[in-house]
Amino acid sequence: MGSSANNPNLTPIDLTVHQRASTRKPSFWSGLGWRDGVFAVLMIALFAYGGLKNRDLMDVYEEVILVFSVLSIVLLGWFWRPLQWIFAVVAAISLLAVSWYGGDLTRGETVFGLKYMFASQPLVMWMSVLFILATVAYWVGLIWPKLTTISWLGSKLTYAGLVMGSAALMVRWYESYLIAPDVGHIPVSTLYEVFILFALLTTAFYLYYEEHYD
């Protein structure tokens, strides 16, 4: 059987419509799968739990910010799917650190997992180490293109650094409230935090375009 282009019964207009239909890209919503649905449900449930638990401490503006935050995270996770597991791992590390602190900031110096891994400062140091190792791996892969495994390793190290840095900001946010309620702040209030955020945004943009054009 021949294609529709060889069908003598089709007019030029029919052919044009058929060609447009065959080349039309699927819509954004049609590309979503069950994993995207599970991700959305988990994020909404997590934010709903946090909002309900702290409702007495929030005003209407903070509630609106909370709603738009969860919508933004869900849409970003749908747009670039690696963000789904990044958000999940960052949330897991952050909740683990919060549980280990137990409302006592001094535990950051006595609990091994906090002192060397999941307090904000160790997380930032791990981020820095991973970014340095990733840079070395990328340079080796650039100089010797046949060593594809090295470039792959550089990408994975970069993802790991992104996770560590993001978790550092979340844990630092909690730590600031442990110092004193009036000291608590969103972790973009100092130059130190802004530099970390800049590194994370630059890394996220790079990883997105690396995957997009790979």
How does the language model describe each region?
Residues 2-110, 119-214:
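Hydrophobic cores of alpha-helical transmembrane segments in multi-pass integral membrane proteins
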